[in-house]
Amino acid sequence: MASQGTKRSYEQMETGGERQDATEIRASVGRMIGGIGRFYIQMCTELKLSDYEGRLIQNSITIERMVLSAFDERRNKYLEEHPSAGKDPKKTGGPIYKRIDGKWMRELILYDKEEIRRVWRQANNGEDATAGLTHIMIWHSNLNDATYQRTRALVRTGMDPRMCSLMQGSTLPRRSGAAGAAVKGVGTIAMELIGMIKRGINDRNFWRGENGRRTRIAYERMCNILKGKFQTAAQRAMMDQVRESRNPGNAEIEDLIFLARSALILRGSVAHKSCLPACVYGLAVASGHDFEREGYSLVGIDPFKLLQNSQVFSLIRPNENPAHKSQLVWMACHSAAFEDLRVSGFIRGKKVVPRGRLSTRGVQIASNENVEAMDSSTLELRSRYWAIRTRSGGNTNQQKASADQISVQPTFSVQRNLPFERATVMAAFIGDNEGRTSDMRTEIIRMMESAKPEDLSFQGRGVFELSDEKATNPIVPSFDMNNEGSYFFGDNAEEYDN
């Protein structure tokens, strides 16, 4: 993007830092990762987890959720002001799985939030280390993106369920800061804005008074974030209109849905970063790896190297396929839920199958499931190649895509055509060209119609051997473009229920 010079890299957002050079960025990201790892080791000690139990991804998720809950100030304040029966606002906890007499057992633990905050700060040189907390949130968000479909949420805001490739980060909390905003898809932010506008339509006081002023500031800020994701002048001009509207209403909702649809072909810039479960960082720290000294990047080879030699386990339900569970977690680790399966499969060195053909449910286990009937197996999280994660949507062009998910949002910076079904997308743009944004709409539709199938995205960018740490010899893969490329094709995934 042309305005690259004015932007902070996401590592800088991630660490809350001002402008730093590459070495400083690598060191501060490394410090953040090391802090998560030290915290995890300490929690395993407190919970008396064996080495094997500490590598169980379900235990990792429980520990991660506890620290997020301990630092969720707004919710903590709310819980203290609205006490609910049987819930101690000062405590947090969850299921911890232990191996007892050859069987897995679930143990519900409860901890003082204050105690968890103490352990976290101690692991992070006495600081609150909010960057590390955001990093954990993004890992959970990536896991949700790979696991669930958001059909209901899309339909509720008047968007089309086939627009799921725009929904990255849809379960990220608002408090996830700049790093969180960077990884949100165009559809996610459009949906948040539509939700605000709808509240304003239903509630006369939403935009009024002191609270309303704050709401307005949040609205305009969100509009600017969405504007910054678009790469064409017409899309940005339309966002200015939405932002400047005196009294946002149905016209703005229409504009936002139009813009979200247009992003299926004129893709927005959405950041991708590999965020791994805390237990992976813990394992590395325990084996003597000094993240701050070595430096770390979320968008380079480092996460791939880390996964090459980490052994992580998962509980497997009786009828689940462990290889499929591995694919799900691999996609989550690399934020690849909306990537073209052919690209992911090439990098991973294993066939990657669409969501609808996976014999696995989510990673987390509900409290009413019988754990004793479950086995654990090793997650295969290694890869054949590595590739740089992208923060752009790639340039846009067309090619056959599937009936359910009609576009992709690239994760890896690898040369290919980007599939979308032009006929399907364009069908959504019939008529409706009136109103204040008509000239911009006409321009956007013209650009979409002239997007060419043969244009390659990320020209000359390729994947790299794992031995090629400096990314010197790109291998540009060739893909069989007749194969299915969308993950959510023929989908039967569970809905995300908060």
Swiss-Prot record:
Q: Where is this motif: Unconventional nuclear localization signal?
A: 1-18
Primary location class? virion
The Gene Ontology biological process annotation of the record reads: symbiont entry into host cell; viral penetration into host nucleus
The record, for SUPFAM superfamilies, names: flu NP-like (SSF161003)
Compositional bias of kind Basic and acidic residues = 8-22
Where along the sequence does the record place the motif called Bipartite nuclear localization signal?
A: 198-216
Renumbered residue ranges of the record's region Disordered: 1-22
GO CC terms: helical viral capsid; host cell; host cell nucleus; ribonucleoprotein complex; viral nucleocapsid
Q: What are the recorded GO MF terms, alphabetically?
A: RNA binding; structural molecule activity
PTM summary from the entry reads: Late in virus-infected cells, may be cleaved from a 56-kDa protein to a 53-kDa protein by a cellular caspase. This cleavage might be a marker for the onset of apoptosis in infected cells or have a specific function in virus host interaction.
InterPro entries in the record, alphabetically? Flu_NP (IPR002141)
What Pfam families is this protein classified in? Flu_NP
Location relative to the cell? Virion; Host nucleus
Name the keywords, alphabetized: Capsid protein, Helical capsid protein, Host nucleus, Host-virus interaction, Ribonucleoprotein, RNA-binding, Viral nucleoprotein, Viral penetration into host nucleus, Virion, Virus entry into host cell
Q: Which family does it belong to?
A: Belongs to the influenza viruses nucleoprotein family.
Q: What does this protein do?
A: Encapsidates the negative strand viral RNA, protecting it from nucleases. The encapsidated genomic RNA is termed the ribonucleoprotein (RNP) and serves as template for transcription and replication. The RNP needs to be localized in the host nucleus to start an infectious cycle, but is too large to diffuse through the nuclear pore complex. NP comprises at least 2 nuclear localization signals that are responsible for the active RNP import into the nucleus through cellular importin alpha/beta pathway.
Q: How does it assemble?
A: Homomultimerizes to form the nucleocapsid. May bind host exportin-1/XPO1. Binds to viral genomic RNA. Protein-RNA contacts are mediated by a combination of electrostatic interactions between positively charged residues and the phosphate backbone and planar interactions between aromatic side chains and bases.
Put simply, this protein is called: Nucleoprotein
Question: Source taxonomy lineage?
Answer: Viruses, Riboviria, Orthornavirae, Negarnaviricota, Polyploviricotina
